């Protein structure tokens, strides 16, 4: 009988320990849920539609200076270290051709901390005003870019009308 009593007490103590650990795990999960609730929306890639990006200036690979969004209809942010970026360049150039968006209306910002342009830059220089800047450069900061690739469609006033990770999913641009 004493062995049976000891076994019941041991099982009871083990159940209490398990209950305490479960409460600890639940508390931690609630903390993580609160942290994740405050995280960046995965659909939010930068300046939200309806808002205008901040002021910026960039110098293109051909030496032209682009200041702000005046005259721009599409702005693309690509990265030299992004594995998806080279895959998105052909759909991006097809989007520009399909909607007849001229080179002067498109800015492609390539983020490269070392300043070395990626191989896909050669596909962009004829269809966009392309510039290479650091990841925290003026244009990326003005558009509040949270990841790469990022594509922004702008209206005549320079406000963002749409944004996305995939250029082929972008809506048709408004007439300029």
Briefly describe each language-model feature range:
Residues 34-66:
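N-terminal "domain-start" segment that seeds a small globular fold
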Residues 77-80, 109-114, 134, 156:
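Structural motif
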Residues 91-125, 137:
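Structural microenvironment flanking redox-active thiols in thiol-disulfide oxidoreductases
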Residues 122-150:
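Short, internal strand/loop/helix patches
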